[in-house]
Regions:
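Secretory-pathway glycoprotein ectodomains that are cysteine- and/or Ser/Thr/Pro-rich
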Residues: 21-65, 69-167
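Sec-dependent bacterial lipoprotein signal peptides
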Residues: 1-19
């Protein structure tokens, strides 16, 4: 049995350490992430949960551990979904989207609120294109993207999601 003063010291130290913690709350995105660990990072250029004003440019940074194909899909706060990049071949490492050769910019536009961006990675070139257009709730968005990747072996696919705010 531990002496009372040791337990009190541990509890006091723990309380002091925890008082310096910051708790960040993020939306419940409901994404079922694969366990293959092929995407090593996904975030907007200012970091996950950052804020962008309407009219500003945003880049999405995707890190991968293997060569393969990336599709980026956006889900706006009003539920409208669209494909930002489709079946783009990437080498291992970090790729910033849009790439210079894409000849486009991702310019932030209304609606204001949470903008979700989902990266879908496959080691092999997808045999079909992900068709996403229209309005989805979280469940419908998950259903569409999950159905797209299930034809690929679990070790050959990964899905991750990030978000930022539009003000």
């Amino acid at each position: 049995m531990r002496p009372v003063h040791t337990t009190a010291l541990i509890a006091g130290t723990l309380a002091l350490g925890l008082s310096a913690c910051t708790v960040s709350v993020r939306p419940n995105l409901g994404l079922q992430v694969s366990g293959s660990n092929l995407i090593s990072g996904l975030k907007p250029d200012r970091g996950e949960g950052s804020t962008y004003a309407v009219g500003e440019s945003v880049r999405i940074l995707v890190g991968t551990r293997s060569a393969g194909y990336i599709t980026l899909v956006a889900l706006q706060s009003n539920g409208y979904a669209s494909v930002l990049a489709r079946n783009v071949y990437v080498q291992p490492g970090t790729t910033a989207f849009p790439r210079a050769q894409d000849g486009v910019a991702f310019t932030v536009a209304p609606p204001r609120g949470v903008q979700r961006v989902r990266a879908i990675f496959t080691r092999v070139r997808p045999s079909s294109d992900l068709v996403v257009s229209g309005t989805y709730d979280s469940s419908g968005f998950n259903t569409v993207t999950n159905a797209y990747v299930t034809s690929y072996a679990q070790e050959d696919r990964d899905v991750q999601e990030t978000f930022f705010y539009i003000r």
